[in-house]
Amino acid sequence: MASLRELKGRIESTKKTKQITGAMQLVSASKMSKAEQNARGFVPYADKLQEVVSSIANANTDAQHPMLMKREVKKTGYLIITSDRGLVGAYNSHILKNLVNTIEKNHTSKDEYTIIVLGRKGYDYCRKRGLPVSKSVLGVPDHPTFADVKELASETVQMYADGDIDELNIIYNHYVSAISQVVTNKQLLPIDNLDESGAATSDYEFDPNQEQILEVLLPQYAESLIFGALLDGKASEHAASMTAMRSATDNASDLIDDLSLSYNRARQAAITQEITEIVGGVAALE
């Protein structure tokens, strides 16, 4: 059995850990609230841009664009959004497990796919396992702006335009609520989720022509989808961090209770032993 000094030391150490995890929980909660606002605030812009693109793409015209057309898939790009730091529970492992399962299911050679990474955890994971990483951005801020990912988003879209990849999928944690985040794996390019009712619900006049507008808008739209997923993923990351720190704080409380009980029992046993020795000594003197 541990000594009273050891038990007391463990109790004090656990109390300090509890204070740290409690503070980290509050910080994560604050970051999550801001990240959630950012993610939800971006939705109206993304929806309006999709409406405009849908209206042009679905108009009665011969206008076409490679980003709207499926082609034979010889190589697939996977854009994964992970965190730069740990202490986020299963946030990263769920994304990386989904990536590995998708690769094992759809590919037999590393030549058939490449990975674009946002976040150090995903980058380190891929490098350690020898997975092909073509582009990466590390050290993404807690509340990113479009400028933070503009270069990577633009280069990734250009990879599709140049034929370096024939489709682009994105894998990230979709934010549902503070206690619920869902791993999402969806196709980003070619774009095939445009609302076909767009042309019927919106009346636009095009100047210049549709082809020229699509040439500018479609890359911007694809880049906005990447940024929107990043904002969504950041909200999920902070929610996962908050949940992990709350769980750690609760576990620390339980451990303190258990250690305190053990300490009190040990102290009681020590007192009883001392009393027994005193009584025995008195009896011997008599």
UniProtKB/Swiss-Prot annotation:
Q: Which CDD domains match?
A: F1-ATPase_gamma (cd12151)
Any one GO BP annotation for this protein: proton motive force-driven plasma membrane ATP synthesis
Please give one Gene Ontology molecular function term for this protein. proton-transporting ATP synthase activity, rotational mechanism
Bilayer topology annotation: Peripheral membrane protein
Superkingdom, according to UniProt?
Bacteria
Which keywords belong to this entry?
A: ATP synthesis, Cell membrane, CF(1), Hydrogen ion transport, Ion transport, Membrane, Transport
Keyword tRNA-binding recorded: no
Q: Does the keyword Cell membrane apply?
A: yes
Please give the InterPro entries that the UniProt record associates with this protein. ATP_synth_F1_ATPase_gsu, ATP_synth_F1_gsu
According to its record, what are the GO cellular component terms?
plasma membrane; proton-transporting ATP synthase complex
Where can this protein be found? Answer: Cell membrane
Gene3D superfamilies tied to this protein: 3.40.1380.10, ATP synthase, gamma subunit, helix hairpin domain
**Where mainly located?**
membrane
Q: What does this protein do?
A: Produces ATP from ADP in the presence of a proton gradient across the membrane. The gamma chain is believed to be important in regulating ATPase activity and the flow of protons through the CF(0) complex.
Instruction: Give the record's family classification.
Output: Belongs to the ATPase gamma chain family.
Which NCBIfam families does this chain map to? ATPsyn_F1gamma
PANTHER family associated with the record: ATP SYNTHASE GAMMA CHAIN, ATP SYNTHASE SUBUNIT GAMMA, MITOCHONDRIAL
How is the quaternary structure described?
Answer: F-type ATPases have 2 components, CF(1) - the catalytic core - and CF(0) - the membrane proton channel. CF(1) has five subunits: alpha(3), beta(3), gamma(1), delta(1), epsilon(1). CF(0) has three main subunits: a, b and c.
This chain belongs to the protein called: ATP synthase gamma chain
